[in-house]
Amino acid sequence: MESTELWLWLDEANGYSQVESNPYLHELKDKIKIVSWNVEKEIVGTPFLKIKEYIHAAKNLAAKGDDFRIISLYKYGGLYFDLDVMFLKDFTPLLKGHEFVYAWEYQPYANSAILYLRKNSYITNYLAKKLQKRKAAMPWVLFDYKDKKLANLRNYPCTFFDPLWGGYCEGMPLSKFTDFFKEFGDGFDKKKTINSYKEFFPGAFAYHWHNSWDAKEVENSYFGLFNREFNQILNNNKQYTNF
């Protein structure tokens, strides 16, 4: 992507304080911007200060993540994406167009796992007001298709960013999300046509593997194949956003 700066937000108390001791973050710190997230500080001077009791209320991590993406994009603008997403194509053409979310199969609301909002835009300001009013940031609350004020928020097909979510189709390299981390062999073979992330779901902009945080890193897997490729790109000092 052109002139892109990648920010990794880490909770100030649980994550950011371990930046120097975390080997995975240490190897990335010169290539991306690692930023501390303290919601109490971030809502100062914003409309969210009016609902600080809701913001600070006990929530599960998913709900906190829903709050985070709206607050951060309101303040800074940009493209939010979940960390279980792998980019397959340059997003530049999408970022030059409308602000967007993507469809969540047949649900009557959009998925905000990938969400592009511009700072101080009509849609961004409206979503901030809606969050204040509803005191909830879940996608079925904020991104309900019945909300006509979101008519100009582009809703891309699910297959653009989540090609396996709608189910397996003949020719796909995977039939289950966990297959992304599965070792090749015993009837599960790598497709001969896939030797790069560029050939993995070539019609999609991204692949969303949906959690699997406890999956083992297997070298002889699709994850291992692409992990080596991305490491090589980084080690060769190429632009990490150059797709």
Model-derived features with residue positions:
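Active-site acidic Asp-centered loop
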Residues: 76, 81-82
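Glycosyltransferase-associated regions of secretory-pathway enzymes
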Residues: 1-65, 83-243
